[in-house]
């Protein structure tokens, strides 16, 4: 339903951010580990976060960023924050 398509929309946005960084043929999945698989450093991660904050008009505190392990965590978090 609507949640699923919102989830998909957020995922596509995150996927686009990652592919801008890693190359357009980079395969992004929900269980990719942000730090291990993506080797995202804190600067890249902050760029993603700031982009998401602006795109969805939300605020993501540092402790929540630290708690995000995978791409899926990031997508779920944004979904939760925006579906109030």
Task: Walk through the language-model features, giving the residues of each.
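Two-component histidine kinase catalytic core, primarily the HATPase_c
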Residues: 44
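Phosphopantetheine carrier-protein modules
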Residues: 19-39, 56-67
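Short active-site alpha-helical segment characteristic of glycosyltransferases
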Residues: 48
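Thiotemplate assembly-line natural product biosynthesis machinery
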Residues: 4-27, 79-84
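C-terminal structural segments of small proteins and small subunits
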Residues: 67, 72-83
């Amino acid at each position: 339903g609507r949640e699923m398509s919102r989830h998909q929309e957020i995922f596509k946005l995150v996927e686009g951010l990652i592919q801008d960084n890693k190359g357009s043929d980079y395969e992004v999945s929900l269980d990719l580990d942000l730090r291990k698989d993506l080797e995202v450093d804190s600067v890249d991660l902050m760029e993603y976060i700031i982009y998401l904050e602006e795109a969805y008009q939300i605020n993501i505190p540092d402790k929540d960023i630290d708690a995000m392990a995978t791409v899926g965590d990031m997508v779920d978090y944004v979904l939760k924050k925006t579906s109030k």
